[in-house]
Curated annotation (Swiss-Prot):
SMART domains on file: DEXDc, HELICc
Protein name: DNA repair and recombination protein RAD54-like
Organism: Drosophila melanogaster (Fruit fly)
The keyword Plastid belongs to this UniProt entry's keyword annotation: no
Helicase C-terminal domain sequence ranges: 503-660
GO terms for cellular component: nucleus
Mutant phenotype after disruption: Eggs and embryos exhibit variable alterations along the dorsal-ventral and anterior-posterior axes. There is a reduction in the level of meiotic recombination and an increase in the frequency of non-disjunction. Larvae have increased sensitivity to ionizing radiation and MMS.
Amino acid sequence: MRRSLAPSQRGPLRPESRHSFTPPLLKKNKRSCQQELEREQELDRRRLGALRDASNTSELPLPIRFTANSEYELAIAKVLARKFKVPMDNYVPDYGGKRVLGVRRCISRRPLHDPMACNALVLFHPPAYTEHERMGMDPTKVLVHVVVDPLLSNILRPHQREGVRFMYECVEGKRGNFNGCIMADEMGLGKTLQCVTLVWTLLRQGPECKPTINKAIVVSPSSLVKNWEKEFTKWLHGRLLCLPMEGGTKENTIRALEQFSMTSARLGTPVLLISYETFRIYAEILCKYEVGMVICDEGHRLKNSDNLTYQALMGLKTKRRVLLSGTPIQNDLTEYYSLVNFVNPEMLGTAAVFKRNFESAILRGQNTDSTEQERQRAIEKTQELIGLVDQCIIRRTNQILTKYLPVKFEMVICAKLTAIQLELYTNFLKSDQVRRSLADCNEKASLTALADITTLKKICSHPDLIYEKLTAREKGFENSQNVLPSNYKPKDLNPELSGKFMLLDFMLAAIRAEGNDKVVLISNYTQTLDLFEQLARKRKYGFVRLDGTMSIKKRSKVVDRFNDPESDSFLFMLSSKAGGCGLNLIGANRLFMFDPDWNPANDEQAMARVWRDGQKKPCYIYRLVASGSIEEKILQRQTHKKSLSSTIIDNNESAEKHFTRDDLKDLFTFDANILSDTHDKLKCKRCVQNIQMKPPPEDTDCTSHLSQWYHCSNNRGLPDNILAQAWMDCKCVSFVFHHRSQAQEIVPSAEEEATDQPEEKPESRKRSSTPASDDSADEDFRGF
């Protein structure tokens, strides 16, 4: 048929045919309708005949005019009345397939996902109405269930489902008159996945049958921006597009942020991923307009309410604030107050009111020399504070992971100083330099004292780290030039000059010889990483190194290469300041923490690199400290801080309180003949002359206080044959604390449950790529 004969080319339709089909019986009586139908059928027969004749001649027929009563229109109406069928194999619709083509959906509200489906996670339940009440209600105002997308609810673990529900109730004001919360889960519990679930749910639905928010902002360290984008893509399979702010010119960044901020309608990229530094620079743009919700990853960066980043984020026009931090208390309660005040302003009052009502009383009761009245008041104030913050904080420990992960053995190893280290250490303590530092020391330790502390820590690691000070005859080393042996070579590492390095060398050799385990070596100093490199080259071990000088893109490749079972990398050398947070190093199952940090959170983050989802082997964590030295004093300071965190965050009233502030001030004392200064200060009742006579309580594990661990003054009873053999061979170990996690339960991991997801290599979460200076490890030191 020629195209000019097509109905669309034959002129306009009759006016009545432009509307939807209306049965003629509604307008005319039966007889007139029958007559009109017969006339239309006769006209249709004539038109069809004209079309057949026109196909053989050049003559054009009269214009074809379809009416609402034609058989053609009746057929179309029947097609449109059919049930809508999704063209997918084995597709089962949520509501019985009641949708039809061409018909406007029913105006009655219903949830986006079926609340009665198997494994459904319902975040909001509407009020239960009787049928009589429903008859008198406006169907367009009925509240509906808020149900998490089955794509996510089917892979969430029980504690993650609880976390999503808690955060939803907080941001929606269901748990008091506040809209913020702190997700304080420890590392490895899936805080990112829980936040992805929350954001996706709020962007898609709400009780009013419409999205709760139209956009959200995720603020994180710069090295985590790309990882957040990959996490959204991984869990949502590309259903949500994000706007990552990394790189790019200033003009392009301003244009993108202005477009994101000004648009109030639904965006194509409703989630902005931005670093703390970039947010601070462009805060003026982002704070002009309202935003649905803000999420702050690694939220302990906001511990100081006076810094510019904190103040910029406080200016953001949003009531829904979520802060992620596995360590909300790192140093003191003032920092904790800053975090709570960020998510829920005025919950705890002003800073002065908080200090007067809570902080002073709690800290006085924490000291061992406190009176009974002070301890009782501290308990009362602690319970009062817990009652307030419980409305907005959720905290789960790594204990949950025991059912998903292999067993973990954690050991604190006290290594003896060598004769050379001992002479350098004692000479420095007796020097005029240290005496002047102690004389000037006040509530906030002077910069000179901090430098002296760093020097002592380096002596504990290896004399090579202070070689330049020795040759330059700096203050404190005027009488130590002849301590090093005559054959000493600064660029040729000699492990025998350090007790910790000698132990490390023995253990690495045994691990390499006895199996295919891989090892992570962590230090707070890049100079120590240089010594690790020298040792690896000397023993011909394959290794990779990650510190602050490595670009973010290269980090991901390095991690993937190390985790590959086929790679020849035996060691992963890591700077805790540059990459101790978020890296997934499950290719290794042994980790050495070579030197302690003042902040226990930094050490905890670094030591969580191997015992994570995907780990298949038993894990061994070794923490090395020099016996009786300042490193043990730092370990004791960590115990004090963890006791405070345990009391406030974990609601553990029986947290041990063994160290007074006077004990913690005693940094520059040293006893060369002691097995473990920490064990002596514990005043352990289970040991007699440093020999354990009674095992720890059965309900304890490696998360318990050191006083509840196993205590070993010899190599008998150690859980690790490698350490037991090294203790006997190198004779440089004086004491060991050790414990293990609870037994593993056979439970599928999240990756195994998500069978419908494409395989993807684990993505690492990285910290800022700013190079870490050697002295940065003491930035969290506080005066006692």
